């Protein structure tokens, strides 16, 4: 039987480099601190959750994806190498110690998506670098998306009672949930997604972004409207999606940061921006790498 090779260890750093998207099963890497745990496969699939010493959990992220839209061509592609049926001009996943970076290129647009969990804090951090490798300018949108079960799992005949809203002056969207995971008794928590600049649009309602019959690989908001729809949520299933403007000259690169986490109080929610100041996400990533040397 012929042996098939899906990747190899990097020669210059402690990473395993996966060069084939379609591995026999999801190839996971794990990121964690004392209170927040996450994992991601070679195509971005995975979860993020906070738990306490008794194992009580809040499943904040039940899946994740990053999309790059071409507003002129009215098309979109993912930064995680999905869907499998579509060819990419370049794909690579680097599983490192405490982080994963997925690089994809298609239609002259290259993305580098890095995910990690900092040494402290109830959140995971995403850093996305986009490069225009075309000879012409590109008018793009960059959308970070996370499915969640912080408002309980979806059931076809179930009912969701939570709400989710936007705080655009703080560059974030948030919801609320009751959990005993942090305090030992039911406490109102504030799950959120934030970014390091002004959002162009957002979605918090799952049916507004994915659609009733859409999927992560084909969200109805992107297929029908080309981007997020500015939906807030009242007693429906929640999701988190933030869209950023990404206009690029030929050869230009831009970096965007996103954070998905849980704030225990509204005061903590108002302080999220401190960990998204220029250079801070990169500093947190270096700290993770240094701790694992």
Question: What is each PLM-predicted segment?
Answer:
Residues 1-293:
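Anionic coordination/interaction segments
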């Amino acid at each position: 039987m012929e042996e098939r090779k899906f990747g190899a260890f990097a020669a210059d750093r402690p990473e395993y480099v996966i060069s084939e998207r379609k591995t026999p099963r999801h190839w996971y890497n794990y990121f964690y601190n004392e209170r927040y745990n996450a994992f991601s496969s070679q195509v971005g699939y995975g979860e993020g959750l906070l738990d306490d010493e008794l194992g009580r959990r809040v499943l904040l992220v039940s899946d994740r994806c990053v999309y790059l839209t071409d507003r002129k061509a009215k098309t979109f592609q993912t930064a995680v190498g999905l869907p499998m049926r579509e060819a990419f001009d370049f794909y690579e996943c680097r599983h490192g110690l405490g982080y994963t970076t997925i690089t994809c290129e298609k239609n002259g647009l290259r993305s580098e998506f890095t995910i990690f969990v900092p040494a402290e804090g109830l959140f995971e951090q995403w850093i996305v670098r986009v490069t225009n490798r075309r000879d012409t300018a590109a008018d793009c949108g960059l959308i970070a998306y996370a499915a969640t079960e912080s408002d309980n799992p979806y059931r076809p005949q179930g009912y969701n009672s939570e709400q989710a809203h936007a705080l655009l002056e703080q560059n974030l969207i948030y919801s609320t949930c009751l959990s005993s995971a942090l305090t030992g008794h039911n406490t109102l928590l504030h799950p959120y997604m934030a970014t390091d600049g002004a959002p162009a649009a957002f979605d918090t309602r799952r049916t507004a972004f994915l659609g009733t019959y859409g999927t992560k690989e084909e969200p109805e908001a992107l297929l029908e409207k080309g981007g997020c729809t500015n939906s807030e949520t009242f007693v429906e299933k929640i999701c988190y999606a933030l869209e950023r403007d990404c206009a690029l000259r030929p050869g230009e690169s831009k970096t965007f940061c996103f954070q998905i986490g849980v704030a225990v109080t509204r005061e903590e929610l108002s302080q999220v921006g401190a960990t998204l100041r220029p250079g801070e996400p990169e500093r947190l990533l270096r700290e993770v790498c240094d701790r694992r040397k």
